[in-house]
Curated annotation (Swiss-Prot):
Cofactor: FAD; heme
EC number: 1.16.1.9
Topology of this chain in the membrane: Multi-pass membrane protein
Protein name listed in UniProt: Ferric reductase transmembrane component 3
Entry's induction text: By iron deprivation.
Organism: Saccharomyces cerevisiae (strain ATCC 204508 / S288c) (Baker's yeast)
Length: 711
C-alpha cells in the first residue's frame, strides 16, 4: 500500500497548492471590528444624498458625511465604554479593511487624516431624526440604537469566533487525556502506582469504569439485526468518548447570543439557522487535526501515553462520525438560512457552496463504507477507498473555505498526515527490503524469519510491524503482525502467520508451490506499539491463545531470563490452542522456556471423541508437587496424547478456567500483572474477570495489559 500512500501525499500537496492566497482565519469578535461593522450597519439604514453605479457600494466608505458619521459613532461608543484613543486608532485598520471592498481611497490615509476628518465632521454634526432622508451632513445616532447594533454584531461575530475556541478545547481535551494517561503510564515504572492501586476509590473506579468491557464485548464484535456490527470501546475508552460527546454537544448547543431586534437578520429563524450553520461548520473543521493524528501510525501521543493504536482508531471513528454529523447540520442549517434569506438561487451557484456540497457527499460515502461489515469483508477495498476519498475530502474542504476562513485546521491536518507518511517511508527504507525465509508448519501456519538492521532497531515483546510481501500479485498490501526477536540467531526477526483470507492465503499458496519452503523479499515498517511494563510487577500471568501467542511468549522469555535479577516470585504462561499443530511453529521459543523460571501450561481446546463403554478411561489425579523446575503438575487425561513434549510443561484438555487461574495467582504475595492476547471472546473474559479480581483483592495491586488489537 506504500505506493498509494506516496501518491496520496503528493496529491494532497498538489491540491493544497491549487488555489492561490487562501484567506487567513481572523477573529471577528474583537472590539475594533465589531464597533466598525456595527456603526457601518446602523449608518447603512440611513438615506444619504448619494448615488453610485455600484449596487453594493457603501456610503460609509465612499461618501464623506457618512464616513465622518461612522468615525463619530465609533468614537462615542468607545468613550461610553471607557476606551482610550489608542483603541480608537485600532479601528482605522478595520475601516480600511472593510472599505477595501468598495474603494481604494482610504488605504493611504494616516491616523492624522482620520482625526482631521472626525474633527471636521464634528463641527457640522446634527442629531439624526427618524425618517430623515437625502442627508448631506454628518449625523449623530442615538446611543441606544448604537448599543443595539453593537450587541447584534457582537453576538454574530462572537458565535463564529467561539466555534474556533470550542474546537481548540476539544483538541486540548484529548491532549489532556493523553497527558494524564502518560502520567499513569510512567507511574508503572515506580512503586507509587502499586500504592495507588490499593486505594479504595481507585479500586472501585478501575473495577467499574476503566478495566471492564461494555456488555461483555470489546475484542469480540457486537451485532444488531445482523446488519449493524462493530466493536464497542472498553469502559475507559467509553468514558473518554462520553466526555468528548458531552463537550461537543454543549459546544454545539450552548452559548448563542441572539438579537431580539433582528437588526442584521430579518427574523429569529434566520439568526438561528445562520448561527447554527457557522458553529457546526467550524466545529466540523476543528476535528481535522485529531482525525489525521489518531489515524496515523506515528502518533506522538501514542508514544508518550502508552495508549494502544486500537484505542486511537476507536477515537478516530467517533471523531469522524461527529465530524460528519457537524457537516450535515452545517449543510442543513445553511441551506435553511439561504431559503429564509431568499438567497438560495444565488448561493447554490457560488464556488464555496458547490465544493461544500461535494465535501459533504464525499464524507458521507466515507462514513458509509467505513461500517464494520465493509472493513471485515473488503478491507483492502475499504482502505484504498478511504485514502482516495480522504484526499478528495481534503481538497473539497480546502476549496470550500479558501476564500472564507478556517483553512488553518486543514493546514494542521495536512502537516500531520504528510509527516506521518514521510516517517513511514523512512522506516521502510531504513529496514531495507531483505529476503525472508518462509516455512510452512502444519497445514496453515507459516514461520517467517528475516534479518533486521543491527543498529537502532529492536523489537520489544508485544510490538508489531506492518509487512508487505513483495510479490507482484499483492505487493501493495500492508498488514500488521506481532514480531519476535529470534532466539536462534541474533539479528533476525521471527513472524508467525496463520492462513486466513486475503494476503496470508496467497502467501501460503506461494510457499506450498515451492515445496513448503520459500524465500521472498519483504518491506517491513515498524516496530510499533509499546511493550507492557510487566517486569515491574512481582507476579505475572500471561494468557494467550489462537494467533496471539508471539507477544506473551516474548514476555515469558524476557521475564524468565531476568526473573532472578528482578526478584520475580511467579511467572506463568497459559496457552490455549485448538490442537497442538500451532505449537510446532513456536517450538524453538517454547523449548527456550524449559531452562527458565516460567511455568508453562498448555490447554488443548479441541473436542475429544466421546468414550464408548469399551473404552478404558484412566484419570490420574496427582497431588500437587513440584519438579526440579518448580512446575506444578495438574490432572491429565491419558487418552489425549501430546504430539509435542516440552520438559516441565503441564498439558490440559479443555478450556482454561480463567476465574480459577486469576484467583490462584491473586492469592500470591506481591503485585500482579495480567497480560492477555488471544481469541476475542477469551480476551473479553480475561478483562472482565481481572476487573472483578481488582475489587476482590483489596490489598493487592493488580494491572491488566491487553495486547490484542483489532481495527
Amino acid at each position: 500500500m506504500y505506493w498509494v500512500l506516496l501518491c496520496g501525499s503528493i496529491l494532497l500537496c498538489c491540491l493544497s497548492g491549487a488555489s492561490a492566497s487562501p484567506a487567513k482565519t481572523k477573529m471577528y469578535g474583537k472590539l475594533p471590528l465589531v464597533l466598525t461593522d456595527a456603526c457601518m450597519g446602523v449608518l447603512g439604514e440611513v438615506t444619504w444624498e448619494y448615488s453610485s453605479d455600484d449596487l453594493y457600494s457603501s456610503p460609509a466608505c465612499t461618501y464623506e458625511p457618512a464616513l465622518q458619521s461612522m468615525l463619530y459613532c465609533i468614537y462615542e461608543s468607545l468613550n461610553e465604554k471607557g476606551y482610550s484613543n489608542r483603541t480608537f486608532e485600532k479601528t482605522f485598520a478595520a475601516i480600511k479593511e472593510d472599505c477595501a471592498y468598495y474603494t481604494d481611497n482610504l488605504q493611504n490615509m494616516t491616523n492624522a487624516d482620520f482625526y482631521n476628518m472626525l474633527n471636521n465632521g464634528t463641527t457640522y454634526i446634527i442629531q439624526y431624526s427618524e425618517g430623515s432622508a437625502n442627508l448631506t451632513y454628518p449625523i449623530e445616532m442615538d446611543a441606544q440604537v448604537r448599543e443595539n447594533y453593537y450587541y447584534s454584531y457582537h453576538g454574530f461575530y462572537a458565535n463564529y469566533d467561539i466555534g474556533h475556541t470550542y474546537g481548540g478545547i476539544i483538541c486540548a481535551y484529548f491532549v489532556g487525556v493523553m497527558i494524564l494517561a502518560s502520567i499513569l503510564h510512567y507511574l508503572s515504572y515506580t512503586p507509587f502506582k502499586t500504592a495507588l492501586f490499593k486505594q479504595r476509590l481507585v479500586r472501585y473506579v478501575r473495577r467499574y469504569l476503566t478495566i471492564p468491557t461494555i456488555w461483555g464485548k470489546h475484542a469480540s464484535s457486537f451485532s444488531y439485526l445482523k446488519i449493524f456490527t462493530g466493536f464497542l470501546p472498553t469502559r475507559s475508552e467509553g468514558v473518554i468518548i462520553l466526555g468528548y460527546l458531552v463537550l461537543h454537544t454543549v459546544f454545539l448547543a450552548y452559548g448563542y447570543q441572539y438579537d431580539p431586534y433582528n437588526l442584521i437578520f430579518d427574523s429569529r429563524r434566520e439568526q438561528i439557522a445562520r448561527y447554527v450553520a457557522d458553529r457546526s461548520g467550524v466545529l466540523a473543521f476543528a476535528h481535522f487535526p485529531l482525525i489525521a493524528l489518531f489515524a496515523g501510525r506515528n502518533n506522538f501521543l501514542e508514544f508518550i501515553s502508552g495508549v494502544k493504536y486500537t484505542s486511537f482508531i476507536m477515537f478516530h471513528k467517533w471523531l469522524g462520525r461527529m465530524m460528519f454529523l457537524d457537516a450535515v447540520i452545517h449543510g442543513a442549517a445553511y441551506t435553511s438560512y439561504s431559503v429564509f434569506y431568499k438567497d438560495w438561487a444565488a448561493s447554490k451557484e457560488e464556488t464555496y457552496w458547490q465544493f461544500g456540497v461535494a465535501a459533504l457527499c464525499i464524507v458521507g460515502v466515507m462514513v458509509f463504507f467505513s461500517l464494520a461489515m465493509f472493513r471485515k469483508f473488503f478491507y483492502e477495498a475499504f482502505l484504498f477507498l478511504h485514502i482516495v476519498l480522504g484526499a478528495l475530502f481534503f481538497y473539497t474542504c480546502w476549496e470550500h473555505v479558501v476564500e472564507l476562513s478556517g483553512i488553518e485546521w486543514i493546514y494542521a491536518a495536512i502537516a500531520i498526515w504528510t509527516i506521518d507518511r514521510l516517517i513511514r517511508i523512512v522506516r521502510v527504507s531504513y529496514f531495507g527490503f531483505p529476503k525472508a525465509s518462509l516455512q510452512l508448519v502444519g497445514d496453515d501456519i507459516i514461520r517467517v524469519t528475516v534479518k533486521r538492521p543491527v543498529r537502532l532497531w529492536k523489537a520489544k515483546p508485544g510490538q508489531y510491524v506492518f509487512v508487505s510481501f513483495l510479490h507482484h500479485l499483492y505487493f501493495w498490501q500492508s498488514h500488521p503482525f506481532t514480531v519476535l526477536d529470534s532466539i536462534i540467531k541474533d539479528g533476525e526477526l521471527t513472524i508467525i502467520l496463520k492462513e486466513k483470507k486475503g494476503v496470508t492465503k496467497l502467501v501460503k499458496k506461494y510457499v506450498c508451490c515451492n515445496g513448503g519452503k520459500a524465500s521472498m523479499r519483504l518491506a517491513i515498517e515498524g516496530p510499533y506499539g509499546s511493550s507492557s511494563p510487566v517486569n515491574n510487577y512481582d507476579n505475572v500471568l500471561l494468557l494467550t491463545g489462537g494467533t496471539g501467542l508471539p507477544g506473551p511468549i516474548a514476555h515469558a522469555i524476557k521475564l524468565g531470563k531476568t526473573s532472578a535479577a528482578t526478584g520475580k516470585q511467579f511467572i506463568k504462561l497459559v496457552i490455549a490452542v485448538r490442537g497442538f499443530n500451532v505449537l510446532e511453529a513456536y517450538k524453538p521459543e517454547l523449548m527456550c522456556l524449559e531452562d527458565l523460571n516460567v511455568q508453562l501450561h498448555i490447554y488443548n481446546t479441541m473436542e475429544v471423541p466421546a468414550l464408548t463403554p469399551n473404552d478404558s478411561l484412566e484419570i490420574s489425579q496427582q497431588d500437587e508437587k513440584a519438579d526440579g523446575k518448580g512446575v506444578v503438575m495438574a490432572t491429565t487425561l491419558e487418552q489425549s496424547p501430546n504430539p509435542v513434549e516440552f520438559d516441565g510443561t503441564v498439558f490440559h484438555h479443555g478450556r482454561p478456567n480463567v476465574e480459577k487461574l486469576l484467583h490462584e495467582v491473586g492469592d500470591l504475595n506481591g503485585s500482579l500483572a495480567v497480560v492477555c492476547c488471544g481469541p476475542p471472546v477469551f480476551v473479553d473474559e480475561v478483562r472482565d474477570q481481572t476487573a472483578n479480581l481488582v475489587l476482590e483483592k483489596p490489598a493487592k495491586a493488580i494491572e491488566y495489559f491487553e495486547e490484542y488489537q483489532s481495527w
